[in-house]
């Protein structure tokens, strides 16, 4: 088991968790993998990778992104599958100035696992809450 949505103190004002404490806690819980998905930034990636190696756990590197499609908010977590995916996350994080377009998310999602993420305030959550199958289906088609 692994938590696939973990923010660190590099997600300013969103998490007080220091990377080493996060890794040690996950290891104490018996996890062999630890995931980092800071919000719109990747400043902690190198430190995270080095600490994971130091503590003999497998790093999963990701990015939490706010996006806009048809003037509606969407929220995603992208996890790098390989080095190319990691490079794409670096590129995406370097252009983020608030929300990024859905097209930019799609462009840089290659070689990444894409998850929806929400605090219940994005459009995808509204589609689910209102069981709007037509809009859900259309959205899934866009993501293919």
Q: Where are the regions that the model predicts?
A:
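Phosphodiester-processing cores and adjacent nucleic acid-binding clamps
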Residues: 1-144
